[in-house]
């Protein structure tokens, strides 16, 4: 490779990096105006804001949201993301699944949450990353014979029987809550997730869950 060609390639790389950085800033600006995110691991996106944004920017934000909330290591194919976004923005579909998430359209909002039950993450018996989405730990100690797995609707029923509730998002659909982590001893729920506020389960056990996907929704 000649020195001149190497210089041209270097200049091209620098230019592309700058263009990508500018796109990332625009995605972050759109997210600030269009995205409402809950620490329970679901999001709402303003349809008017997405429709008014440049298509490449709207696509990036939607793809980032699906990837983070779906919890999968690899993002869904871009052509599938584009098709899904076109369908819900146009109103062709009001509900679809993509990348481990459920996307619904209601009035002027898209809602995105984890599709529980389609694929099951490995159960956790010690602190760590669960379902590619949440960092979890148990305080004040991890009870013997317990493991972290999906809350599910049975977990919600047991939690409500204990007079407990998941905070801080009282507006979350039950499908969102069912996709959260719960601490189980066989078929008995020991604790639901403590998210931003302490809500202990049996014997004061608290399952702390912090939404922390490998790649954040907002790029900066």
Report the location of each language-model feature.
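AMP-forming adenylation/ATP pyrophosphatase catalytic core
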Residues: 2-220
């Amino acid at each position: 490779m000649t020195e001149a060609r190497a210089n041209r390639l270097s200049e091209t790389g620098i230019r592309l990096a700058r263009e990508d950085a500018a796109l990332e800033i625009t995605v972050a600006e759109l997210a600030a105006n269009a995205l409402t995110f809950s620490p329970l691991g679901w999001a709402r996106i303003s349809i008017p804001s997405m429709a008014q944004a440049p298509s490449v920017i709207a696509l990036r934000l939607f793809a980032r949201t699906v990837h983070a909330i779906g919890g999968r290591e690899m993002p869904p194919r871009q052509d599938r993301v584009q098709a899904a976004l076109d369908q819900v923005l146009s109103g062709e579909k009001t509900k679809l699944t993509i990348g481990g998430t459920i996307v619904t359209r209601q009035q002027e909002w898209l809602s995105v949450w984890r599709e529980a039950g389609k694929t099951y993450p490995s159960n956790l018996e010690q602190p760590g990353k669960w379902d590619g989405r949440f960092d979890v730990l148990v305080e004040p100690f991890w009870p013997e014979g317990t493991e972290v797995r999906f809350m599910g609707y049975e977990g919600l029923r047991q939690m409500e029987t204990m007079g407990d509730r998941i905070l801080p998002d009282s507006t979350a659909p039950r499908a969102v809550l069912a996709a959260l982590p719960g601490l189980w001893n066989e078929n008995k729920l020991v604790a639901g997730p403590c998210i931003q506020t302490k809500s202990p389960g049996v014997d004061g056990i608290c399952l702390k869950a912090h939404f922390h996907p490998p790649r954040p929704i907002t790029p900066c």
